[in-house]
Curated annotation (Swiss-Prot):
Disulfide bond positions: none
Protein family per UniProt: Belongs to the PTH family.
Transmembrane segment boundaries: none
Name assigned to this protein: Peptidyl-tRNA hydrolase
Biological role stated in the UniProt entry: Hydrolyzes ribosome-free peptidyl-tRNAs (with 1 or more amino acids incorporated), which drop off the ribosome during protein synthesis, or as a result of ribosome stalling.
Binding site for tRNA: Y14, Y64, N66, N112
Enzyme Commission designation: 3.1.1.29
Reaction(s) catalysed by this chain's protein: an N-acyl-L-alpha-aminoacyl-tRNA + H2O = an N-acyl-L-amino acid + a tRNA + H(+)
Length: 186
């Protein structure tokens, strides 16, 4: 069984914001794999299905970004999901819009959703797909930037990165994450 988590904030006011690109990737996977995100439990919304013979759970924590671990850990405990069968997708300011970086482990890098996940799992050793949102320009505050929407010029690159993140998740169901990293980080 595999768990794929997208980080974001709940509520219509946060839909399609930079900080919610992880949620957008989960929506793409749900559509692609015909998985309904209709279960509400563990402080999140999730759905399960079978993809290429593998049971997959897709989760969007509804705790707000900074408390994401409060949703992830109880679901992992309930379904007895090992950390190596878990991947998290989230926004990253240090990567250009439209680009991905896959990592096997690492620090939170200033991302509070990842910090919460590390805190609740008790380890930094989990797989992640970092989705580029770039840094704010013209002196804009980071908080205003990440809670802002993508520009119309960015949308094609954003859609491309969501597709690539979904492709990476699909390949991960049948291949080691390290192999997927070599493909998608090049």
């Amino acid at each position: 069984m595999k768990l794929i988590v997208g980080l974001g904030n709940p509520g219509r006011e946060y839909e399609l914001t930079r900080h919610n690109i992880g949620f957008m990737a989960i929506d793409e996977l749900a559509k692609r794999w015909n998985i309904s995100l209709n279960e509400q439990k563990f402080k999140g919304v999730f759905g399960a299905g079978f993809v290429n013979g593998e049971k997959v759970i897709l989760l969007k924590p509804l705790t707000y970004m900074n408390l994401s671990g409060e949703s992830i850990r109880p679901l992992m405990d309930y379904y007895k999901i090992d950390v190596e069968d878990f991947v998290v997708l989230y926004d990253d300011l240090d990567i250009p819009v439209g680009k991905l970086r896959l990592r096997m482990k690492g620090s939170a890098g200033g991302h509070n959703g990842v910090k919460s996940t590390i805190s609740h799992l008790g380890t930094q050793e989990f797989q992640r797909i970092r989705m580029g949102i770039d840094r704010p320009k013209n002196g804009m505050k980071v908080v205003d930037y990440v809670l802002g929407r993508f520009t119309s010029e960015e949308i094609p690159d954003v859609n491309h990165s969501i597709e690539k993140a979904a492709d990476a998740c699909e390949e991960w169901l049948n291949k080691p994450f390290l192999q997927i990293m070599n493909t998608f980080n090049s």
